[in-house]
Structure formats: C-alpha cells, structure tokens
Regions:
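N-terminal extracellular/periplasmic Venus flytrap/periplasmic-binding protein-like
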Residues: 12, 24, 32, 175-230, ...
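Active-site-proximal alpha-helical scaffold in enzymes
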Residues: 85-117, 160, 166-195, 308-315, ...
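Flexible glycine-/small-residue-enriched beta->alpha junction loops
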Residues: 110-164
Length: 445
C-alpha cells in the first residue's frame, strides 16, 4: 500500500528551564500531557489511537518502556502499542517519521508520535558501584552530558563542534549573538500576538504535589482512561482479564493529572525566553570553550518539555470526518563526520529537495532547530537562504531545547506557520549527535 499521512492535531508543553517550573515532572508525564493535548485537539477518539511512538534521549532511571508509561498516563488503552526511539536531538522528528511510515505502508491508520525530555531529571551515575569498590573514591557521571551532550567518538561537546564549523565558515561571534537576539525578540512577539496558542498547551502545574498537573477539565484522553484496573476479572476469558487488586498499578504512576482544589500555578509560556535580552549583555558572556564563539546566550539552555502530533491515513481521516492540518510528504537523513554536525541540517534539506524535485523557491517556511545560533547560520549559508526567513517565531535558543522533544516541536511549528501563511511547502530540519541530520517535508493545502 502507499497511503498518504496527514496530521490531525498537535500540542506541546511550554518548555521549562533546568530546575524550573517543570523540573519535578517526570518526562513520561510531560509526554502524557502533550499526547493528551494533541489527541484532544485532533478530535480523534482516544480508543482509535493504535500506536504511540515517542522520542527520549535521557532514559536512565526513567523506568521500563517510557513511551508505554506516557501512553498509559495519557489515558490510552492497554491495547494501544508503543515504542521509544533515541536518535539524540532528532528523536522526536524520527518518531513522527516512523509513524508516517507505518501509516504509509498500511500497518496502522492512526498513530500518535512526538518526543519528551526532562533534562532536569537526568541522574548522576556511579558506574563502578555494580561490582563494588575495593577502596578509594568513586566517580559520578552526569547522565545528561554523557548520554545527550557529549560526542562519544571524538570526545568533545556539541558546543565545541558547533564552534568548529562556525570558525571554518567564517561565522563570527557577533553574527551568532545577533541571531540569538533575534530569536528571543521573535519568540516574545509570537507570544504577545497570541500566535502560540495553537501550538502550546498551557499546564496547571501543581505547586505542592510533586510530579502532577492540575486539570480543571481533564483532557479527552485522560477522561477515557481505562476506568478500573483493580477489582478482578471482567469475564471468563483471559482476553477479558482485568488485573486483580494486588496487581493494580500505583495510581500516582498511572496518571499525571489531578483534579480538585489543589494549589497550582499556570505555566503557559516557555520559561527561557528573555524579553530583556540585549546584544550588550550577550557580548559580555565568556564562550563555553576557550577561543570559541558559542556562549550561554547564543546556545539553547537545558530544558524540560514534550511535543506530540496525531497522524492518520488520509482516507481514514476523510471517512471519519476529520480535517487534516497538513500532509507529511517525505523525509531525508544524512550522516557525516560528527565534529561537523552543524553541516547536517543543510545536507538533509538539500537531499530532501532533490528527492522531490523542488527548489529553494518552492519552500515557504523553514524551521531549523537552533542547536546553536551557529547551526542555523551555517544552514542558511550552505543552502543560500536568508537566515531571516528561518524560524519566524524564534527557536530553541529562546524557547528551549528539551532534546528528545525538539524534533517533534519543529514539525508542529512548520505546520502552524504554513497554515498562518496560506499553505505551501515547509521543511523542518535538525542535526543530531554522531554527525547525523534529518529533514521532513510537509505541505499544507
């Protein structure tokens, strides 16, 4: 079969800072909130979601089958299958692409996909403790750096790699700071105009209940949660079996949502956006690497958040009365020497254009993940596209980069940008650790 895949709904959480508003929320609960929001916005009955694919990079200590956890917490049925994918920063985008492939080949009609990350929740590892210490000190390993931000092959940070490419292409510190300033200003303007309401799902974060969201009216998916996983069998067949009380899940693990009169705060905007950013303040910051050009200002922060989309077979969507937001047309992936990771979004986008016989002028919207300002400036330079035409609402430098979620976030952003501008083709592209790049082609109208 060769079905077409359409997107029926998208949602993402606001992104939190390291140790910030979402730091007590497990990644799987963030994923559940995004899933529930996307499903609610799509109008699809939660019971019709056949499969869930979620990207997550920092899985140490999260627990078995993270996507399955998020699926259950979002209220989806035990018959809804799931899988977790890890392609570093491209994880969420790969989840969306994998869902489209399953739909295109006829394996599934409706799949929810996206990504989630709690970088605040990444643990420290004591690797030698398994076999015991004879004597002496032990070494703690930061799982966030080791599993997410460190090139295993060349033993260098992602920031060092971005700075290397910027230096070789002649991209200056001043250009990178100017781009970062633009990202913040665009993000501030997008929220002020109300444009982000279609994209961001506000959260009522319980201020005194660790790891919970307050819902005044539970999202549709949460309301559809299997009503009673305790209390014995509902039938004589094994297939009708409901676990007995002693095997019932912990309610706190089952749903991230709570109701009632609970103290909470409304979290509705990305926490890292700076209205007061200035080029003068940025210029005072020291680079991350000696003699480098990447700083805390022209790189994204360490963030928490999730994003999700509901994808479906076009014919199924039409026959069930659903309106498609966009069509997922194609995907391209490339690999290169990992120190040159900043080249890969341009390489993937170029490959995607060639595959589909499209030119640069055919693309109405570009969303390039701001792994660093240098990555977007590199992409613009290699493709020959004005960087001012990319990331029109700002990007990860301002909004944040929860690494497992960003790939899904930029696909959703491209869709909403295209709809705002009357349709056309859009490309979302992202680099990922190990020297890989991915790009997705979407169409509205």
């Amino acid at each position: 079969m060769n079905s077409k895949t359409v997107v029926l709904g998208t949602a993402r959480t606001p992104f939190g800072r390291l140790g910030g508003a979402l730091s007590a929320i497990p990644a799987t609960s963030l994923g559940a909130a995004a899933l529930a929001g996307a499903i609610d916005r799509s109008g699809v009955d939660p019971a019709e979601i056949e499969h869930v694919i979620l990207g997550q990079v920092l899985q140490a200590g999260v627990g078995q089958a993270p996507a399955r956890q998020a699926s259950f917490k979002a209220g989806l049925a035990k018959t809804t299958t799931s899988e977790t994918v890890n392609k570093v920063c491209a994880s969420g985008l790969l989840a969306v692409v994998s869902a489209a492939r399953m739909i295109n080949d006829g394996s599934n009609a409706v799949v929810a996909a996206g990504g989630m990350e709690s970088m605040s929740g990444a643990p420290y590892l004591l690797k030698e403790a398994r076999t015991g210490y004879r004597f002496g000190d032990g070494k703690l390993v930061d799982a966030m750096i080791a599993d997410g931000l460190w090139d295993y092959y060349f033993e260098m940070t992602m920031a060092s790699q971005g700075a290397k490419v910027a230096r070789e292409l002649g991209i200056t510190r001043e250009e990178q700071d100017a781009y970062a300033y633009q990202s913040h200003q665009r993000a501030v303007a997008a929220y002020a105009s109300g444009e982000m309401k279609e994209e961001v799902l506000p959260l009522h974060v319980a201020s005194k209940l660790k790891g919970k969201f307050v819902v005044e009216k539970a999202p549709q998916a949460a309301r559809a949660r299997i009503p009673a996983l305790a209390g014995g069998s509902s039938g004589s067949s094994m297939w009708d079996h409901t676990p007995a009380e002693e095997f019932a899940p912990n309610p706190d693990a089952w749903s991230p949502f709570v109701t009632g009169d609970v103290p909470h705060v409304l979290f509705e905007r990305d926490e890292a956006i700076r209205e007061d950013s200035s080029l003068e303040a940025m210029a005072k910051l020291k680079p991350i690497d000696k003699d480098g050009t990447i700083t805390a200002a022209n790189a994204p922060g360490v963030n928490d958040g999730a994003a999700a989309l509901v994808l479906a077979d076009e014919a199924w969507a039409r026959s069930n009365g659903h309106t498609a937001l966009a069509t997922i047309l194609d995907h391209a992936t490339v690999g290169w020497d990992s120190p040159y990771i900043a080249l890969t979004p341009a390489m993937a986008a170029h490959k995607l254009l060639e595959k589909n016989n499209l030119s640069l002028s055919d693309i109405s919207v570009w969303e390039i993940n701001e792994a660093f300002s240098a990555v977007v400036l590199t992409t613009a330079k290699l493709l020959g596209v004005d960087s001012a035409k990319m990331n029109l609402n700002g990007g990860a430098v301002a909004m944040g980069h929860p690494i497992g979620a960003s790939g899904a976030r930029i696909v959703g952003t491209v869709i909403h940008q295209l709809r705002k501008r009357g349709g056309g083709y859009g490309i979302a592209a992202i680099c990922s650790g190990g020297g890989q790049g991915d790009a997705v082609l979407v169409k509205v109208g």
